[in-house]
Amino acid sequence: MKKVTAMLFSMAVGLNAVSMAAKAKASEEQETDVLLIGGGIMSATLGTYLRELEPEWSMTMVERLEGVAQESSNGWNNAGTGHSALMELNYTPQNADGSISIEKAVAINEAFQISRQFWAHQVERGVLRTPRSFINTVPHMSFVWGEDNVNFLRARYAALQQSSLFRGMRYSEDHAQIKEWAPLVMEGRDPQQKVAATRTEIGTDVNYGEITRQLIASLQKKSNFSLQLSSEVRALKRNDDNTWTVTVADLKNGTAQNIRAKFVFIGAGGAALKLLQESGIPEAKDYAGFPVGGQFLVSENPDVVNHHLAKVYGKASVGAPPMSVPHIDTRVLDGKRVVLFGPFATFSTKFLKNGSLWDLMSSTTTSNVMPMMHVGLDNFDLVKYLVSQVMLSEEDRFEALKEYYPQAKKEDWRLWQAGQRVQIIKRDADKGGVLRLGTEVVSDQQGTIAALLGASPGASTAAPIMLNLLEKVFGDRVSSPQWQATLKAIVPSYGRKLNGDVAATERELQYTSEVLGLKYDKPQAVDSTPKPQLKPQLVQKEVADIAL
């Protein structure tokens, strides 16, 4: 009995010692000017901006996984599209009178030009190396069938010619021409089927994971930058002097550490919402999140891969979210070409691919539960769509593939689970709550903490999104001559629009193409097309959009 008692006492002392050691460790504060939470492309991009703007600032990056760029930024966990609205039909909605609205498409394209300039600048500085390892020319195509959809694409093509950003786009309704552009899509197709396609040669495939790894590797070369892996944020507390004390747990040895930061960026992808809530800032109460995953069919068969060099986007079917458009894409991953088709929506309560099944429940609070309920009640069609996607069989997915690749063979394809996308739900005075497509920077009034919520267009516009964050949080510094000069060196078109300025558009595309090793030829004459018929559209209830 005495031995048992002694053993229990020893264990208790040992456990207490471990606890005291952890507390002691946590009490040893590390100080940093900027704390970047999350090792993805957003944190990497912001860190790279700040390294040029304020090279003396100290920075610490913490990532819960064993390496950077392993979640949504990983090349296999996203579609790898350089989103510039060249082919994504959801960015050009059709108005009630049949006309096409191009405002969103222009904004998306302008944003991607900023990303191209940012990456080109980093290549010139030696921060990014071997552009072909992370960006490649892959033509972007839209492809539709059926009289109404063909008429839509005619109208879209005509409308986009008003913008200098879309010069060089081709249009065809000829089977032979489209087969030349995308043989895999046309072979085996009914020759009587009414089809149409647009093609833009300057489209890109981007490996955002590789960009992230290279940016962070460059940051690590500086002595005032620290990267802590297998490190999970457990608490955020605002101090009286408006700095933040962030408690970080080492997932390998169980210890904890406090980091005192003047500015905190939460770029943790799906985990950003929960960390924003943990901060306790009032602005966090307006938000909730709803996770949606995506799956793709993948082919690595050389007979398939070598027969397709394009990203081909279709049109969402009636009753489906506009962003859910199927596409069959050439990808360049880990130096190898593959073809992906999808996405197919999946559902999990995880906010991250490597997250917890309790993520959705633990992010639900008394302040955001009502907006979530309103969104659910107001978007029954979206709920039906998600249920139908989850219920898809292997045969269903293969039949969807054959609409874009009529001669597809099952044995050439496997199913791949990509990343999670947490959709933004925001409190709304009129509707109670709304589902918001896109990304949103949420910060406190003092500009000491900011988080990025949302999923689309995401990584392809990391550079303009982080530029927006700088303007929102460091407004006084951004307006200073020093920061203005540096920002214009990083992004030559900063502060002005390219749209409408043909010479400026061509100049920037030529510059970024040369530096990034991309194809670019000055646009030729516009293709002649049948005049689109502007038919009044039936008024249908809009299906809320989501990012997959």
Swiss-Prot record:
Entry's Gene Ontology molecular function annotations: 2-hydroxyglutarate dehydrogenase activity; L-malate dehydrogenase (quinone) activity
Cofactor(s) the protein requires to work: FAD
Documented EC number(s): 1.1.5.4
Keyword Coiled coil assigned: no
Gene3D superfamilies the record matches: D-Amino Acid Oxidase, subunit A, domain 2, FAD/NAD(P)-binding domain
Pathway named in the protein's UniProt entry: Carbohydrate metabolism; tricarboxylic acid cycle; oxaloacetate from (S)-malate (quinone route): step 1/1
Disulfide bonds: none
Reaction(s) catalysed (UniProt annotation): (S)-malate + a quinone = a quinol + oxaloacetate
Keywords of the record: FAD, Flavoprotein, Oxidoreductase, Tricarboxylic acid cycle
InterPro entries: FAD/NAD-bd_sf, MQO
GO biological process: tricarboxylic acid cycle
NCBIfam families: mal_quin_oxido, PRK05257.1-1, PRK05257.1-4, PRK05257.2-1, PRK05257.2-4, PRK05257.3-2, PRK13339.1
PANTHER family the record matches: L-2-HYDROXYGLUTARATE DEHYDROGENASE, MITOCHONDRIAL
Name of protein: Probable malate:quinone oxidoreductase
Native species: Escherichia coli O6:H1 (strain CFT073 / ATCC 700928 / UPEC)
Gene responsible for this protein: mqo
